[in-house]
Amino acid sequence: MRQECIQAVQQAAQRTLTAREIQNIEDRIYRNMRSIARDDPMSWRQLSESERLYRAAQLASEELQREAALKKRRVALTIAARQRLDKFINSYQGADGKLGALNRTIAFNADGKSNFLSVESRTKATRDYALSQLQEAFEAVDPRFFGLFEDEAGVRDLVYEMRGQNTGNAKARKGAKAWREVTDLLRRRFNDAGGDIGYLENWGIPQHHSMEKVGAVSKDKWVSDVIGKLDRKYYTRADGQLMNDAELSAFLGEAYNTIATGGLNKLTDTGMRISGVRANRGNASRQIHFKDADSYLQYQQLYGDRSLWEIMVGHLEGISKDIALVETYGPNPDHVFRSLLDQVKAETATANPSKTGSVERLANKTENLYNFISGKTQPVANPHIARWSDNIRNWLVASRLGSALLSSFSDLGTMYLSAKVTNLPMNQLFRNQLEAMDPTNRTELARARRAGLAMESLLGSVNRWAMDNMGPSVSRWAATAVMRASGLTAWSDAHKRAYGVTMMGSLGEVVSRTPDLRSLDDSDFRILKSKGITDTDWSVWKLAQQEDWGNGNNTMLTPESIMRIPDSAVKHLGEPERVKFEAMRQLLGAVTEEVDMAVITPGAREQLITGSGIQRGTWKGELTRSVFLFKSFPISVVMRHWSRAMGMPSAGGRAAYIATFIASTTILGALSQQLNDLASGRNPREMTGEDAAKFWLGALLKGGGLGLYGDFLLSDHTRYGSGALASMLGPVAGLVDDVVKIAQGIPLNAVEGKSEQTGGDLVKLGKGLMPGANLWYLKAALDHMIFNQMQEYFSPGYLRKMEQRSKKEFNQTYWWRPQDVTPQ
């Protein structure tokens, strides 16, 4: 830059600039010159040299002004976020004090005392609204056979349409349009909270990179496979010139290191991934720009291991989490959270020196919860250990939980108990329940999904019973298939939809007849008033035109009814899109929290307790996950409903809640127990008499908050197989115990001349590991026609002894005797 230019710039800046600042300005001008030439070559050629320089300098000036304004705005947003948090923390009256208040800003707490929409609930509500707008995209990939496969032609057409290439496929075009609209909405909401994601016209869709597949090839191989698929115009030097092959290869080499190591090359000294200003996310994530749809698809085939739908959902979940974090804690959430944590911890410890230990423990729990929610987890230590552990756990889900539907009747108890506490109309809930249970009613399903309800099946989640997964595999497919084939997924979704629809209808009716939030009766609407709903949210809700869904649901307050409010009607309350989006999310967040209370789905707190926060690919992490396999659901039931009970305003209310919970779920557990016996070929048990205590203990274990412990403590597997300790340590430990016992028994049986006993033990082991063999509507037939006959072949008299033991120890007879191939 010439000296007179430097003087002019310094005069405009009203200060002396450093050599580095001057160089940056010069680079920015040259970069903009090349950017203009690349994007609009026709106009560029018609400009004189001075006009080109002026245009580029003008753009550079605008960029600098915009960056300065963004920096200033981020400071203001950080101050505003800190003020909101300080106000909530200082006004919180709970026994867990200010540290407890900070903890509640991170994840949902069921006791009804928070009055704050947590990061977890904000994330879920944002994600579920985004998913609700993507029905066309979901249909375009044509998920078949329980949603486990995607149609290749549909995927190809959708990717082409997302990249702006016409395919003539109307479904794919609508799906791509919906995707563009919802991702752009989320981009705007992120930027409104202080983010800085620019609009990239031909972005289309994010990429997924398989750490294992990329790590399995050399850096040179990966770079050579990728470099020819890229749109080179996006790869420029600092001065705006296009990178040459060597420079681009070096750039891609750094990307390779990050992908192949799972981020190990970007760790802090604590082992956590580096995380700067979260509001800057979105710029770095678009570093690989494919030149067209074919290049994208070819790359995903070579180095991806997820379906298109999983990639789309992953993007929505990621940006939803970022939005929730920057809205709650400001553009640099890590900094604000840690400064608050340090301050509150110091204040609490100073005020209560004798409780320093408990303060430290709560502070550590709070920090761990924040790290888990914000995704600041350690990379996978050993992908092979993690993958094998996943496969074992998924296989056990597929082979052991085929009858889990029969253990799920306790959902009815928690659902109606939650409805009572939330003041929902019971009769309407029952009507909606019947409608949702009708598998032929596609209208009900489409409406509920459009309202953002029960999105778990769209996510392909088996989270209710299983754990987190490394990625797609045969075992994961088998687990998902069994969950869907058993009817458990449909059961859970239907009841979630019924509860959510009832709550939205009830809220619509309450909003229409109540002038403002303060007019709500505290005793009837205590839970609703604990959701952090503001007067502005209530005012926006009243402006929404409610929907009539029929079947008594004629006052539906839905997310779409809020987002359809004309901008002119809410502009007096603030920026229209922001005001409507926040009111919509408060509605969906409140409903989602209560739906997950009514039909339990483990949340962040429960997942952290069951080992999800421990590093994957380590023996400690995988063993912990294995011990807690199947236990996340019963733990969630106990944690959430105990917390809700303890949050009741009076001692009488607490006692009544606990008594109702135990009584209702135990009675439904008894029903589950009887149905499970019938499905296994046994007659219903006597519920009275000398064995009554044993029966009702089993009912309590099966339904009354201890859930699947009943399956392990009182099931066939435990009665005749593994010991109670192995069962308590989880099904993986039980499997190891079975294998060890068989191995020990082989030489013993040979010495005693009972080698056929080993065959019988192997049959029993094989049956327990066969996916789908435990499906509630198949297991009696499979047992009697195949497995029992094999057992009798290897161990003559085994079935007779089993029948005698059942009569002696459990006073139980059979309607389909074990030795009969067909019922007699």
What are these regions (language model features)?
Residues 143-242, 417, 447-456, 460, ...:
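Structured, mid-chain assembly/scaffold modules that mediate subunit interfaces
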Residues 193-208, 423-436, 644-651, 747-759:
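Short linear, low-complexity motifs centered on an aromatic residue
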Residues 641-761:
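Short low-complexity linker/loop segments enriched in small residues
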